[in-house]
A protein has these predicted regions:
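Charge-rich, well-structured scaffold segments of protease-associated domains
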Residues: 1-30, 64, 81, 94-220
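His/Glu-based metal-binding/catalytic segments typifying zinc-dependent metallopeptidases
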Residues: 30-87, 194
Length: 220
């Protein structure tokens, strides 16, 4: 099955070409095979190599692509680990200079998701960095986010979304991906309202869901 997404300056001729080359194609009456989401129990893996750097990643079970709490997750991670103003970057790299890089991010799939925290450092810093990451996780779970942090994160996300929407390529990809996953295609106004709807309770809930120590795996 094929989905064609178009954005930008086009006219009826384009639709005529689509109809000419794709209009006679019949949709297959089949459903894609969707295996159960894999689950790996809590695990720690350390592999030693004779190299000058250490790469550390801590992963947690995330949310799938259909989960509307993604907006709360984006707000949470904007504060926690996304970008140079995040807590992870400021407290571990900027203030202490213990890592070359550090960030957190989320990857969503059709039936599961992965939230990861990754960092690169010298071998002698591994223990302290792991301790500080754990400390940041415990701090944000215990104290949650302030209303000022949530407001600032929402404004940053809305600004980034508006800027990205100026690209016809980004709009094309977003619409195509939504159609492929049977998700609604939101207008810019609708998407901004989704971000605005995020509140302290929804952020606290997603923090507890994602930063669940029972699903954490660490590899270095």
């Amino acid at each position: 099955n094929t989905i064609i997404s178009v954005s930008g300056n086009f006219d009826d001729t384009f639709f005529e070409l689509l109809e000419k080359y794709f209009g006679t194609k019949k949709m297959l009456d089949t459903k894609p095979y969707l295996p159960d989401a894999p689950y790996i129990s809590k695990n720690n893996i350390v592999k030693e190599k004779d190299i000058e750097q250490v790469q550390l990643v801590a992963t947690f079970k995330g949310i799938d692509v259909m989960d509307e709490s993604v907006y709360s997750l984006l707000v949470f991670n904007n504060v926690f680990g996304s970008g140079m103003s995040s807590r992870l970057f400021q407290n571990i790299r900027e203030q202490r200079g213990l890592v070359y890089s550090i960030s957190a991010g989320h990857s969503a799939y059709i039936n599961t998701g992965v939230f990861d925290i990754s960092a690169g450092m010298s071998p002698e810093s591994l223990g302290e960095v792991a301790h500080l990451i754990s400390k940041e996780i415990n701090t944000i779970k215990r104290n949650k986010l302030t209303s000022a942090e949530i407001t600032k994160a929402k404004e940053q996300l809305k600004g980034n979304y508006i800027l990205s929407s100026e690209s016809t390529g980004a709009r094309m990809q977003g619409a195509g991906r939504s159609l492929l996953l049977n998700k609604p295609i939101y207008t810019q106004e609708e998407a901004l309202k989704k971000i605005d709807a995020v509140n302290a309770d929804s952020v606290a809930e997603i923090i507890d869901r994602v930063l669940d120590s029972s699903t954490m795996c660490i590899s270095a």
